[in-house]
């Protein structure tokens, strides 16, 4: 920069990314006494319902973003397509079955990350167990903070999330590491108010609500996410034992 100097291109490059929001639904049948219950009792029921919705929504987002599956069926979703880590991230470290050198595997995965900071890691419970079993040359645990099933928020200063969704609905996924702060984004496009349905068979269970003295509570939301920088991540998969 110089006084009266000519302005030049700053080097930033912008490319549009299209993120298509996906509608997700959560519902539960409850007794039709919900309609006539006191305000206090209805609030208690709705609190429990909302807690369930929040947990299912978080789990569903993980499964869709990690593996590109329909959380309800476990099958690949054509709507999600390649907008998931398993399809978008090409940097892969295959660990031998048994995950004997889990620490070395993570070091190899981090070495593959290109163009981004390593800001976090998501690991499956079995990978956490493998890390807990790592020892130093003198036999002491390499990660004593993982003893007895403990799942700390950080390991070696790196934020870590131990989550079953890393391996659920996937044959070999065990860990994801990379720039979760800058390379992946998600959010709500729209949240639809809670609906209380008193008639019909809204969950296609074959059981009429009136016939079973029930009402159906339904909550829906539109979620969107994107793996903005696939090169800023690496995946760890576990080799499959032949004949197992």
Language model region names:
Residues 1, 40, 132-136, 170-174, ...:
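Short conserved micro-motifs at the rims of enzyme active sites and ligand-binding pockets
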Residues 1-27, 51, 232:
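Assembly/oligomerization interface modules of large self-assembling protein complexes
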Residues 16, 41-45, 205:
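Conserved aromatic-histidine-acidic binding/catalytic patches
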Residues 25, 34, 59, 127-129, ...:
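Short loop/turn segments at secondary-structure transitions that flank enzyme active sites
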Residues 25, 29-112, 235-236, 240-244:
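Alpha-helical scaffold segments that mediate packing/assembly in large oligomeric complexes
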Residues 30-32, 125, 219:
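Residues immediately flanking
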Residues 86-87, 91-208, 213-215:
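Extended oligomerization regions of viral-like shell subunits
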Residues 205-244:
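Protruding loop/beta-arch "assembly-hinge" segments enriched in small, turn-prone residues
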